[in-house]
């Protein structure tokens, strides 16, 4: 998703395509990648994170889609409010938390990840990781001036509706409270 995000290309198309495919195809391939990997522990660490993301998407998205239909709140807003709820529970300030702090865009890490995706190089994966960090830094906006500039830029680019929910709102959206409680129970 994050590789040169403003342009459709073969690398970011993989993420979109994978959301439409059956997971067993990827997981069978992943098992082979891990067997053949020179760095099995790093490959397993990546796939464990992938499995967590997959499980969260698989279990929560059906609820999120229903919530969107009922409330009109966007997918990214619901996810952002769910992130807020979990961060607040851990006594972490959601306005300043950088979700990408755990990403280390080394060529070594990128090479491990690239093994899972046919036709994608370690350099492309490293760029993707760097874009993820950049987007996180850009969208983490405690400063009201930065927020106004961000939202203005989104509107000018015609991306406001789809992207504004990725910026943590200053205050919780009360309309999301019950949805977050439902997701927390999933």
Can you name each region flagged by the protein language model?
Residues 1-186:
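N-terminal leader/auxiliary helical segments
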């Amino acid at each position: 998703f994050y590789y040169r995000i403003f342009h459709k290309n073969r690398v970011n198309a993989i993420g979109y395509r994978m959301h439409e495919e059956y997971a067993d195809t990827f997981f069978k391939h992943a098992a082979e990648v891990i067997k053949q990997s020179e760095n099995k522990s790093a490959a397993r660490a990546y796939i464990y994170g992938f499995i967590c993301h997959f499980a969260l998407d698989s279990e929560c998205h059906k609820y999120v889609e229903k919530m969107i239909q009922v409330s009109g709140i966007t997918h990214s807003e619901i996810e952002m409010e769910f992130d807020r709820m979990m961060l607040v529970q851990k006594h972490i300030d959601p306005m300043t938390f950088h979700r990408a702090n755990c990403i280390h865009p080394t060529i070594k890490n990128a090479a491990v990840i690239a093994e899972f995706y046919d036709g994608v190089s370690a350099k492309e994966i490293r760029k993707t990781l760097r874009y993820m960090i950049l987007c996180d830094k850009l969208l983490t906006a405690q400063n009201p001036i930065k927020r106004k500039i961000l939202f203005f830029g989104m509107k000018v680019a015609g991306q406001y509706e789809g992207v504004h929910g990725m910026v943590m709102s200053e205050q919780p959206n009360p309309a999301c409270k019950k949805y977050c409680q439902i997701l927390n129970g999933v």
